[in-house]
Amino acid sequence: CAAVERLALMEKVEGDDIFLLKTAALYHDAGFVHQYSSNEEIGAALAKEVLPRFGYTDEQIEVIHQLINATKVPQSPKNKLEEIICDADLDYLGGDEFHIIADKLKRELMERNMVQTDKQWDELQIKFLEQHRYFTKTAIELRRDNKKARIEEIKARLKTYKD
């Protein structure tokens, strides 16, 4: 939620739009409670169910629904707010907390038998990092160099594995 607010402010987004972005950020991973993959639709449905009780309008809920669904990978945002939530969702790829979050994700995937080895994990990371792109000018400027450094770091590590 902090990343979405930071990016929104730096992108000159104000008022209700920041409120909607922060709400979408809170709900966008809520579907993980029910299932691991393709959880965005569940989070969006949960938001649709709960938010009317807190005075959200149908129009606001529809925007939140679209924002949540925009975070599905591969991401294809259709407007500025969707670009912001997509960049915030994967902000860590170029952030200082990359190793901490990547390690947690690696453990999740290993527990689900989606990767079995460090080499498989690094190959998956390289593929994801190279296919990913930031959309907002702010995220590109803030995260591009760190993300590039992570790619080079992982590529170097991949060269050390023995097959």
Q: What is each model feature region?
A:
Residues 37-38, 98:
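Hydrophobic alpha-helical membrane-insertion segments
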Residues 9, 29-30, 48, 52:
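Charged, amphipathic alpha-helical interaction segments
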Residues 16-34, 43, 64-72:
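His-Asp-centered metal-binding catalytic motifs of divalent-metal-dependent phosphohydrolases/nucleases
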Residues 2-15, 27, 56, 73-163:
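Divalent metal-dependent phosphate-bond-processing catalytic cores, especially two-metal-ion Mg2+/Mn2+ enzymes
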Residues 3-4, 39-54:
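An active-site-proximal "capping" alpha-helix that borders the catalytic cofactor pocket
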